C-alpha cells in the first residue's frame, strides 16, 4: 500500500447478536403500539441475558399490547428456538417494568399530535422537540446506496450470514455473528480494494473449523463481494478464535442502543450519541437522524457534492432546529452556506414537520433494527427517497 493510500474499517453484526436482539425487541414493541395507536409515546429499552429478557422504559398509550408475546415472537423469528442454542423463545423469562412518559417531557412535545390524517401548520409549529440533542446524517456517492463501502459490505455479509443459516444452506450455523470489513482507499479517496474481512459466527459443537472457513468463503463471502475488490493480499479471518459455540445472550448480555455505529455509517461519519431503537418518532434522536440522512442523500444524489454530512440540533420544547450545519469535505459544487439555505427552504425540519414529511407514525421500525437504518435495498424506507433532487438543484441556482 502506497503512502498516499489509507485503510478504513467498519463492522456489522447479525440479528442474533445480543445487542441486536435487544434493539429488535424494542422496535417490535414500538411497531405493535403504533399499529394500534399512531400517537403512542414510546421509549422502550430491553436487556437480554441468559434465560431472560427485561423491558423497561416509558410508554404512554390508550391501547394494549401483549409485551411478553412480542418478545417471544421476536426471539423466535431471530432463531433462538432451542435450549442448546443458549436462548429459547418459549422457555425464557420475560419481565416488564414500564412507566408512563413524564408529564414534564409530554408538555414540551404536546400541543397536539392527535388522531388526524393531516397535521396543521399551527400544530407543527406548536410541537417542540422532546429533548435537546444533535444528530448527523451522511451520504457518499462511492456506492449505489450512497453509503460508505466498509459499512455497506459489512451489512451485506452479516445479512448473508443470517440468510444461509435460515434457508438451511449451512444448518450448523447459530444466530450470533459479527462481520468486519477493511477497505483501502486511493489517493483520490476512492475505494479500490478490500484489505481484510473478519467473520465470526456461532456454530454447532460438532463442526470443524476447516469446514466453517470453507463454507463461509463459498456461501457468504464469494456471493457478496465482487472478485475485483479482492486480491492475493486480501486477508480473511473466519472464526479466528477457533471456536464460537456459546453465543447470543448466554455469551454476553445485550442492551438496546449499544450498536449505534453499526446502525448508522460504520464510523465514517460523526454521531450525536443517541440511539434509535425503541423510540417513537417524536424523539428527535431518531426522527431527526433520519431527516439528516434524507437531506444528505438528496444533496449527493443531486450532484451537489460527492459526500455530505448534515448536522441538526434541537432544544427541548422548541420546534425549529437551533442549528443546521453541512460539511461536504471539499467535494461540494456550491458553497455550503448555499446548501444550508436551500435545505432550510425546502425541508421542514421541525419535529412534527419531519414526522409529516417522512410519514413516520407507522409500524416501520422493527425492519431497521438489524443490518442498518440507512442504505437499505431490501426494505422501502422513506428517508432513503431521492425525491428532492430537482428542488435542490433549482434552489442553489436561484
From Swiss-Prot:
<keyword id="KW-0460">Magnesium</keyword>
<keyword id="KW-0547">Nucleotide-binding</keyword>
<dbReference type="InterPro" id="IPR022628">
    <property type="entry name" value="S-AdoMet_synt_N"/>
</dbReference>
<keyword id="KW-0067">ATP-binding</keyword>
<dbReference type="InterPro" id="IPR022636">
    <property type="entry name" value="S-AdoMet_synthetase_sfam"/>
</dbReference>
<keyword id="KW-0630">Potassium</keyword>
<dbReference type="GO" id="GO:0006730">
    <property type="term" value="P:one-carbon metabolic process"/>
</dbReference>
<comment type="similarity">
    <text>Belongs to the AdoMet synthase family.</text>
</comment>
<comment type="subunit">
    <text>Homotetramer; dimer of dimers.</text>
</comment>
<dbReference type="Pfam" id="PF02772">
    <property type="entry name" value="S-AdoMet_synt_M"/>
</dbReference>
<dbReference type="InterPro" id="IPR022629">
    <property type="entry name" value="S-AdoMet_synt_central"/>
</dbReference>
<feature type="binding site" description="in other chain">
    <location>
        <position position="101"/>
    </location>
    <ligand>
        <name>L-methionine</name>
    </ligand>
</feature>
<feature type="binding site">
    <location>
        <position position="279"/>
    </location>
    <ligand>
        <name>ATP</name>
    </ligand>
</feature>
<dbReference type="Pfam" id="PF00438">
    <property type="entry name" value="S-AdoMet_synt_N"/>
</dbReference>
<dbReference type="GO" id="GO:0005524">
    <property type="term" value="F:ATP binding"/>
</dbReference>
<dbReference type="Pfam" id="PF02773">
    <property type="entry name" value="S-AdoMet_synt_C"/>
</dbReference>
<feature type="binding site">
    <location>
        <position position="252"/>
    </location>
    <ligand>
        <name>ATP</name>
    </ligand>
</feature>
<dbReference type="GO" id="GO:0004478">
    <property type="term" value="F:methionine adenosyltransferase activity"/>
</dbReference>
<comment type="function">
    <text>Catalyzes the formation of S-adenosylmethionine (AdoMet) from methionine and ATP. The overall synthetic reaction is composed of two sequential steps, AdoMet formation and the subsequent tripolyphosphate hydrolysis which occurs prior to release of AdoMet from the enzyme.</text>
</comment>
<feature type="binding site">
    <location>
        <position position="252"/>
    </location>
    <ligand>
        <name>L-methionine</name>
    </ligand>
</feature>
<dbReference type="InterPro" id="IPR022631">
    <property type="entry name" value="ADOMET_SYNTHASE_CS"/>
</dbReference>
<feature type="binding site" description="in other chain">
    <location>
        <position position="283"/>
    </location>
    <ligand>
        <name>L-methionine</name>
    </ligand>
</feature>
<feature type="binding site" description="in other chain">
    <location>
        <begin position="258"/>
        <end position="259"/>
    </location>
    <ligand>
        <name>ATP</name>
    </ligand>
</feature>
<dbReference type="InterPro" id="IPR002133">
    <property type="entry name" value="S-AdoMet_synthetase"/>
</dbReference>
<keyword id="KW-0963">Cytoplasm</keyword>
<feature type="binding site">
    <location>
        <position position="19"/>
    </location>
    <ligand>
        <name>Mg(2+)</name>
    </ligand>
</feature>
<feature type="binding site" description="in other chain">
    <location>
        <begin position="243"/>
        <end position="244"/>
    </location>
    <ligand>
        <name>ATP</name>
    </ligand>
</feature>
<feature type="binding site">
    <location>
        <position position="45"/>
    </location>
    <ligand>
        <name>K(+)</name>
    </ligand>
</feature>
<feature type="region of interest" description="Flexible loop">
    <location>
        <begin position="101"/>
        <end position="111"/>
    </location>
</feature>
<feature type="binding site" description="in other chain">
    <location>
        <position position="17"/>
    </location>
    <ligand>
        <name>ATP</name>
    </ligand>
</feature>
<dbReference type="GO" id="GO:0005737">
    <property type="term" value="C:cytoplasm"/>
</dbReference>
<dbReference type="GO" id="GO:0000287">
    <property type="term" value="F:magnesium ion binding"/>
</dbReference>
<comment type="pathway">
    <text>Amino-acid biosynthesis; S-adenosyl-L-methionine biosynthesis; S-adenosyl-L-methionine from L-methionine: step 1/1.</text>
</comment>
<dbReference type="InterPro" id="IPR022630">
    <property type="entry name" value="S-AdoMet_synt_C"/>
</dbReference>
<feature type="binding site" description="in other chain">
    <location>
        <position position="58"/>
    </location>
    <ligand>
        <name>L-methionine</name>
    </ligand>
</feature>
<feature type="binding site" description="in other chain">
    <location>
        <begin position="176"/>
        <end position="178"/>
    </location>
    <ligand>
        <name>ATP</name>
    </ligand>
</feature>
<protein>
    <recommendedName>
        <fullName>S-adenosylmethionine synthase</fullName>
        <ecNumber>2.5.1.6</ecNumber>
    </recommendedName>
</protein>
<keyword id="KW-0808">Transferase</keyword>
<keyword id="KW-0479">Metal-binding</keyword>
<dbReference type="GO" id="GO:0006556">
    <property type="term" value="P:S-adenosylmethionine biosynthetic process"/>
</dbReference>
<keyword id="KW-0554">One-carbon metabolism</keyword>
Amino acid at each position: 500500500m502506497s503512502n498516499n493510500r489509507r485503510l478504513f474499517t467498519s463492522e456489522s453484526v447479525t440479528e442474533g447478536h445480543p445487542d441486536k436482539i435487544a434493539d429488535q425487541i424494542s422496535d417490535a414493541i414500538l411497531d405493535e403500539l403504533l399499529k394500534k395507536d399512531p400517537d403512542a409515546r414510546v421509549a422502550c429499552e430491553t436487556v437480554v441475558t441468559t434465560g431472560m429478557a427485561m423491558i423497561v422504559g416509558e410508554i404512554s398509550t390508550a391501547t394494549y399490547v401483549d409485551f411478553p408475546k412480542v418478545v417471544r415472537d421476536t426471539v423466535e423469528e431471530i432463531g433462538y428456538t432451542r435450549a442448546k442454542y443458549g436462548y429459547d423463545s418459549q422457555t425464557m423469562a420475560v419481565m416488564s417494568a414500564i412507566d408512563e412518559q413524564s408529564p414534564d417531557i409530554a408538555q414540551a412535545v404536546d400541543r397536539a399530535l392527535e388522531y388526524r390524517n393531516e397535521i396543521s401548520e399551527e400544530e407543527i409549529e406548536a410541537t417542540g422537540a422532546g429533548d435537546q440533542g444533535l444528530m448527523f446524517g451522511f451520504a457518499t456517492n462511492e456506492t449505489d446506496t450512497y453509503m460508505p463501502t466498509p459499512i455497506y459490505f459489512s451489512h451485506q455479509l452479516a445479512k448473508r450470514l443470517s440468510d444461509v443459516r435460515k434457508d438451511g444452506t449451512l444448518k450448523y450455523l447459530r444466530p450470533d455473528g459479527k462481520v468486519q470489513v477493511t477497505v483501502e482507499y486511493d489517493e483520490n479517496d476512492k475505494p479500490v480494494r478490500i484489505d481484510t474481512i473478519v467473520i465470526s459466527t456461532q456454530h454447532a459443537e460438532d463442526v470443524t473449523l476447516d469446514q466453517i472457513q470453507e463454507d463461509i468463503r463459498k456461501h457468504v463471502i464469494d456471493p457478496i463481494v465482487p472478485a475485483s475488490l479482492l486480491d492475493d493480499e486480501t486477508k480473511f479471518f473466519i472464526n479466528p478464535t477457533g471456536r464460537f459455540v456459546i453465543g447470543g445472550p448466554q455469551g454476553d448480555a445485550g442492551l438496546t442502543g449499544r450498536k449505534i455505529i453499526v446502525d448508522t455509517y460504520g464510523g465514517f461519519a460523526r454521531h450525536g450519541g443517541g440511539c434509535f431503537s425503541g423510540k417513537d418518532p417524536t424523539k428527535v434522536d431518531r426522527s431527526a437522524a433520519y431527516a439528516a440522512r434524507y437531506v444528505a442523500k438528496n444533496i449527493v444524489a443531486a450532484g451537489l457534492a460527492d459526500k455530505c454530512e448534515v448536522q441538526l440540533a434541537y432544544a427541548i420544547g422548541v420546534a425549529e432546529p437551533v442549528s443546521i450545519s453541512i460539511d461536504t469535505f471539499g467535494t461540494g459544487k456550491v458553497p455550503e452556506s448555499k446548501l444550508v439555505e436551500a435545505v432550510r427552504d425546502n425541508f421542514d425540519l421541525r419535529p412534527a414537520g419531519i414526522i409529516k414529511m417522512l410519514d413516520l407514525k407507522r409500524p416501520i421500525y422493527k425492519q431497521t433494527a438489524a443490518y442498518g437504518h440507512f442504505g437499505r435495498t431490501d426494505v422501502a424506507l422513506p428517508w432513503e427517497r431521492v425525491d428532492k433532487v430537482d428542488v435542490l438543484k433549482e434552489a442553489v441556482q436561484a
